Amino acid sequence: IVLTASQPFTTALIASNMREFKYCWIWDKVRGVGFQIAKFRPMMRTEDVVVFGNGNGALATYNPQMVERDKIKKSKCYSSSDSSPLAYNDGLEREYTHKYPTNVIEVSNASQKGKVHPTQKPVALMEYLIRTYTNEGDVVLDNCMGSGTTGVACVNTGRKFIGIEREPRYFDIACRRIEDAQRQARLIA
């Protein structure tokens, strides 16, 4: 279960189920929001992405989205048969071109063409989270689908999607956006 939130709701959300809370990501929106109240408080540039899961974390799907290194790291490999970390196998050098992600996801909210919902997220953010926590062909549920961004991201990443939205206006918008994404996917395929 992956939910987005901001304080103080983040704290209440985590406290609601401490047993299944795993960790938080920080979504860096690159550009601050809330300019209307900037005279009274800092503009908000980040939002929390709260991850929950039941049972053993080792059983949950986690596909880390590796980040390309600016500079290739070269390192000598340790011998698997030698217990000393100082003993190198001569000539075995490995190049590391990627690194594991940190808990900060930088996805700009500035380039959201046609934003139609007040809490609409960028498709790229949802694609990142979907690739991280699901495999192709999995089913993703969005019980507050708003304008359908998660559904669009599911189409783009080869996942199935179930969306729930109580506002008929937003439900219609979501259906149109998802159908458009499906048409685009068929054109590319």
Question: What does each of the following model-derived ranges do?
Answer:
Residues E179-A189:
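S-adenosyl-L-methionine
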Residues R176:
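Acidic/aromatic/glycine-rich contiguous surface patches that form carbohydrate-binding/processing clefts
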Residues I1-I173:
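Core catalytic lobe of class I
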